């Protein structure tokens, strides 16, 4: 009896070890990120190695993604949980080996993976359009880095009233598709770079037949004119700067005018294609008793109705919600990044954007199985946990079951549906600011 039992156990262990030696982690994770795309990005960035290591560079991309999805876990634990290392004599990987592998990978390869997957997933998603235009928005965000000498030298601190900030910071500008929350492009620099300078880098990455919503911080006639001239029907909408001078050319409707704005010599010097004047469309709307002026490049009143355009600008807030999902939900409100060196800081930031898009693209697939639901009507926090659990499940699954597991994930949209938001039961009230110490009631002054 016992010899037979030991024989069966030995056969089982032999099969497991044989399967583990032949298993390729890229095979199971390839449905999320194409292994050929990762290899191509590594080759284009010049990140190649001839030595066969236990942590291949292709799998280190998944480590960077896991860093963003599992913010509270150490790096070596993420590698062990995802099981992305090649078989070896030791069952686990040392923490120092993960750091060395990150340094070999660098940031350029991860940036290329994010850029290519952003374009690929954006083109593969059937976005809803408004008057034939895809709705985009750009906005800036700050990231805090660990206070190390290397980061301090690479990322100058912002000063307030002559006092430097507590941590070095990175300034980032992202472009987002508003209905799916997919990031389509991103650029970042130091606090010495203005958001307009970073937004210039997004012009070439913006597609045709798009409408980009911006806040008033991006008001620059050179930037806006260059945005329109970079392609076909690349429109923008932005609040008019306070005190801006313009000349009304023609009235298009109630609160709707075609206007002409003069450019400055400094702007024409910086933007060679900028003329002396810029023609735009000015919309004047009243919201809750406040008059707002919106400037846009959509001058065709027949194609773009002014009444709908005024309501369209409120959707710009979707990118703010996207930043909240990244910082509070995915990063667990841990405002300081992990990496202690500038190259690894950039690598970590590209990994955060890549992980966010990965979750959002899976939410798009789940929404396709739900009639009448959009991706932004699903729970982002639940989807994050579901994607991370699936990544760990794929490593232990046989190759034949991987398509079935992926179909199961896409059909799990019922579990992450957000309930319909209930209406307000009581009127909104602004409460009095709490004070640290109690205050005595004021005595009425006596009349002399």
Describe the residue ranges of each PLM region.
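Short Lys/Arg-enriched helix C-cap and helix-to-coil transition segments
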Residues: 108-124
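A short structural micro-motif
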Residues: 85, 105-108, 120, 332
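Short, basic interhelical loop/turn and adjoining N-cap
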Residues: 83-99
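Single, function-defining residue in the core of a domain
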Residues: 1-75, 90, 102-105, 112-115, ...
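Short alpha-helical "recognition helix" segments of helix-turn-helix
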Residues: 78
């Amino acid at each position: 009896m016992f010899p037979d039992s030991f024989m069966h156990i030995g056969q089982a262990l032999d099969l497991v070890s044989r399967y583990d030696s032949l298993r390729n982690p890229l095979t199971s994770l390839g449905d999320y990120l194409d292994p050929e795309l990762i290899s191509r990005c590594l080759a284009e960035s010049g990140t190649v190695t001839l030595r066969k290591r236990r942590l291949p560079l292709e799998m280190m991309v998944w480590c960077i993604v896991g860093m963003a999805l599992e913010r509270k876990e150490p790096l070596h634990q993420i590698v062990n949980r995802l099981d992305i290392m090649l078989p070896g004599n030791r069952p686990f990987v040392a923490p120092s080996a993960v750091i060395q592998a990150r340094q070999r990978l660098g940031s350029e390869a991860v940036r290329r993976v994010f850029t290519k997957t952003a374009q690929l997933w954006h083109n593969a998603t059937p976005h809803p359009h408004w008057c034939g235009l895809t709705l985009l928005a750009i906005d800036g965000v700050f990231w805090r880095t660990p206070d190390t000498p290397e980061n301090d030298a690479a990322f100058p601190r912002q000063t307030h009233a002559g006092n430097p900030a507590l941590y070095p910071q990175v300034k980032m500008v992202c472009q987002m598709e508003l209905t799916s929350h997919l990031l389509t492009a991103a650029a970042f620099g130091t606090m010495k770079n203005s958001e307009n300078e970073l937004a210039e880098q997004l012009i070439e990455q913006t597609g045709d037949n798009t409408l980009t919503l911006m806040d008033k911080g991006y008001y620059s006639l050179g930037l806006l004119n260059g945005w329109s001239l970079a392609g076909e029907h690349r429109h923008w909408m932005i609040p008019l700067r306070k005190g801006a001078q313009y000349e009304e050319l023609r009235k298009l409707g109630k609160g709707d005018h075609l206007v002409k704005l003069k450019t400055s010599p400094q702007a024409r010097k910086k933007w060679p294609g900028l003329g002396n004047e810029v023609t735009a469309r000015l919309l004047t709307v009243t919201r809750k008793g406040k008059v707002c002026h919106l400037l846009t490049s959509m001058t065709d009143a027949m194609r773009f109705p002014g009444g709908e355009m005024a309501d369209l600008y409120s959707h710009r807030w979707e990118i703010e919600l996207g930043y909240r999902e990244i910082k509070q939900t995915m990063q667990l409100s841990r405002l300081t990044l992990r990496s202690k060196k500038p190259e690894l800081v950039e690598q970590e930031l590209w990994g955060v954007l890549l992980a966010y898009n990965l979750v959002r693209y899976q939410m798009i697939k789940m929404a396709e199985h739900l009639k009448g639901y959009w991706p932004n009507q699903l729970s982002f926090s639940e989807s994050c946990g579901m994607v991370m659990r699936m990544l760990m499940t794929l490593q232990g699954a046989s190759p034949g079951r991987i398509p079935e597991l992926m179909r199961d994930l896409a059909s799990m949209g019922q579990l992450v549906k957000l309930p319909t938001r209930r209406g307000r039961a009581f009127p909104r009230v602004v409460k009095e600011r709490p004070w640290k110490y109690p205050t005595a009631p004021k005595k009425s002054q006596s009349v002399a």
